[in-house]
């Protein structure tokens, strides 16, 4: 009886899971060649995938959840997916170069999703890009609501101006990353002080910063640098994104599961420097911490001890390490100042030698990872080709040896035949020319074997 109940419960769970999958898939449309003509009437969030792609298969259940969520909240954005290998011409038209590629298509515009492939991040991307490029903030209440909702956002304050045109151009390029708003001076909170109008501000880290054209340069570049919070929990994707900012990244490499004083102290030091020395370093540095050293070891092609502090230049793959332990904030500030004035020598880089080293390191890492994960598979992948190559080399070597031996035997045989012919010709010349005369025979010279017999 108990076994029957367990079996019934298992069947019920399986049925629920299957129904959930069917329901989720029902809100994601499979797109074909007709999509090209019919898409302009709606806003589409599309996953361009390949059936053989492993990352695409991992994304599939997340994508089904995105479709269900967008439908349940009444979003005007339709969710679909397209096999880019079957409809390669359409995929090429939208600039698909890898799999999976997530794009939001709005009219003639196509926006790439470049963030993490989680349900929340994809939905946030769809909401941000599908709406207005510049969203108005008509009241202080709305302004305060946006501050609570978004960790980082930009605001243009003022009327029509050349600065606003630059702001719109920057927003059209960077809307895939962050939010852009506009407001009047009356709507801005009282704690905000503006020296001149119009102005562009970024609100983040519980404060604000004003764009200065003379100090900050190009507006788009400034927005691209300031779209990150000053302190971040880093991963490989964020480090890649920070490469476009031109900033150095000061990282505390720690083990978050380790609660020892040494690990928590380094993290606190980086946080304190990011907070208290922002005015000095925020133009040149991004601060954060990373859990574990696996990614950093791959990036640096070296084994870093944990915990430690490393400063990365993600634009050219250089890095800076201190030859002594950082014990307090003053040590970290001194380390940063030494980097800025060139006292600390950079390591790594993207020179030809480093690129060759990278190729060797990547090949070694791949081989080691294969043997660690599956020794039998590693033996098969690398042992079989080596065995085939060894057999081929042996065959070529033995073929050359046999050929030389046969050629040598042929020359010896040819020489023996010529000698035999000469002996026979000599005998014919020594035979008597007439039948009755007796001619004394001349003894032929003996060869070596005959002499030995005598």
Swiss-Prot record:
Membrane topology type: Single-pass membrane protein
Biased composition regions of type Basic and acidic residues, renumbered to the chain: 444-454
Residues of this chain annotated as glycosylated in UniProt: 258, 313
One GO CC term, this protein: cell surface
Keyword field contains Isomerase: yes
Domain Thioredoxin: 25-128
Catalytic activity: Catalyzes the rearrangement of -S-S- bonds in proteins
Similarity comment: Belongs to the protein disulfide isomerase family.
PANTHER family: PROTEIN DISULFIDE-ISOMERASE TMX3
Record remark: domains: The di-lysine motif confers endoplasmic reticulum localization for type I membrane proteins.
Name the UniProt record assigns to this protein: Protein disulfide-isomerase TMX3
Organism, as annotated: Pongo abelii (Sumatran orangutan)
Lineage start: Eukaryota, Metazoa, Chordata, Craniata, Vertebrata
This protein's encoding gene: TMX3
């Amino acid at each position: 009886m108990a076994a029957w109940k367990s079996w019934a419960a298992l069947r019920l769970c399986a049925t629920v899971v299957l129904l959930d999958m069917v329901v989720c898939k029902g809100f994601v449309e499979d797109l074909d060649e007709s999509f090209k003509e019919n898409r302009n009437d709606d806003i589409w969030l599309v996953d361009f995938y390949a059936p053989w792609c492993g990352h695409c298969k991992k994304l599939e259940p997340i994508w089904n959840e995105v479709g269900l969520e967008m439908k349940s909240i009444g979003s005007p954005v339709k969710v679909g997916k397209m096999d880019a290998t079957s409809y390669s011409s359409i995929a090429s038209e939208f600039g698909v170069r890898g799999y999976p590629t997530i794009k939001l298509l709005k009219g003639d515009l196509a926006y790439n999703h470049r963030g993490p492939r989680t349900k929340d991040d994809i939905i946030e991307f769809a909401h941000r890009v599908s709406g207005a490029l510049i969203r108005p903030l008509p009241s202080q209440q709305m302004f305060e609501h946006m501050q609570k909702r978004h960790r980082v956002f930009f605001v243009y304050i003022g009327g029509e101006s050349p600065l606003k045109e630059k702001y719109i151009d920057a927003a059209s390029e960077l809307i895939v990353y962050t939010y852009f708003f506009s407001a009047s001076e009356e709507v801005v909170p009282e704690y905000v002080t503006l020296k001149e109008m119009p102005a562009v501000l970024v609100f983040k880290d519980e404060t604000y910063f004003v764009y200065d054209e003379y100090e900050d340069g190009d507006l788009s570049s400034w927005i691209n640098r300031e779209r990150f919070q000053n302190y971040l929990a880093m991963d490989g994707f964020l480090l890649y994104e920070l490469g476009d900012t031109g900033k150095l990244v000061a990282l505390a490499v720690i083990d978050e599961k380790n609660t020892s004083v040494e690990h928590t102290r380094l993290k606190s030091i980086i946080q304190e420097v990011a907070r208290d020395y922002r005015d000095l370093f925020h133009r040149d540095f991004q601060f954060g911490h990373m859990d574990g050293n696996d990614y950093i070891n791959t990036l640096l092609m070296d084994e870093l001890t944990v915990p430690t502090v490393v400063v990365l230049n993600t634009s050219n793959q250089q890095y800076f390490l201190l030859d002594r332990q950082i014990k307090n904030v003053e040590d970290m500030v001194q380390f940063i100042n030494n980097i800025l004035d060139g006292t600390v020598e950079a390591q790594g880089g993207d020179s030809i030698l480093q690129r060759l080293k990278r190729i060797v390191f990547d090949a070694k890492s791949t081989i080691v990872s294969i043997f660690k994960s599956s020794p039998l598979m590693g033996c098969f992948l690398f042992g079989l080709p080596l065995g085939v190559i060894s057999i081929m080399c042996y065959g070529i070597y033995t073929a050359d040896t046999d050929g030389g031996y046969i050629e040598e035997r042929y020359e010896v045989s040819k020489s023996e035949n010529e000698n035999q012919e000469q002996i026979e010709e000599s005998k014919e010349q020594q035979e008597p020319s007439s039948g009755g005369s007796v001619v004394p025979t001349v003894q032929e010279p003996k060869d070596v074997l005959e002499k030995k017999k005598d």
